[in-house]
Amino acid sequence: MISVREATVDDVDAVREIGLTTWPVAYDGLVSPEFIADGLAQWWSPEVVERGITRGITLVAVVDERVVGMVGLGQEAGFWVMWKLYVLPGYQGQGVGKALLDGAIGALPVGTDQLLLDVLVGNEQAIRFYRKNGFGAPRSTPDRDLGDELIWMARAL
């Protein structure tokens, strides 16, 4: 059974394990090994993970008392953005990602009208998952150019 709960600082190591395990697999062949190494150092350090837990919304999925997935949300220019949603490879395809997404939407403030995310061009597995779960082209986005590597997706709420 999958349970989703708010992350605490006691989950920093488990959340980092998810990032350090999933990033190399998720982005292999899509970006350079240097990009992966830089991203792991920049976005999955203990300090950054703890800051996400204490200042944003971070939820974890638990199966058999093990943290197996995480989702992180924050605000940018008044928009709610899902910055991270990762599930350990051995638990993918079992509803963990959907449970995390549902939990994330439920954790947003009342009145939030859309949830944004950015996704790497070519990450077809992620794009399929998000489309299957109601994401498409956004109505509006923060005034930030994502370049050619990322695209915005949104789900109306």
Where are these regions (language model features)?
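Non-catalytic, surface-exposed connector residues within folded enzymatic/regulatory domains
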Residues: L30, Q94-G95, G147
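Acetyl-CoA-dependent GNAT
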Residues: E6-V12, R16-G90, L101-L108, P138-D143, ...
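Short coil/turn segments at alpha/beta junctions that flank glycine-rich nucleotide-binding fingerprints
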Residues: Q94, V110-D113
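C-terminal "cap" of GNAT-fold acetyltransferases
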Residues: F79, D113-L157
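Extreme N-terminal starter segment of soluble prokaryotic enzymes
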Residues: I2-S3
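Conserved glycine-rich acetyl-CoA-binding loop
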Residues: R66, K84-D102, L120-R128, K132-N133
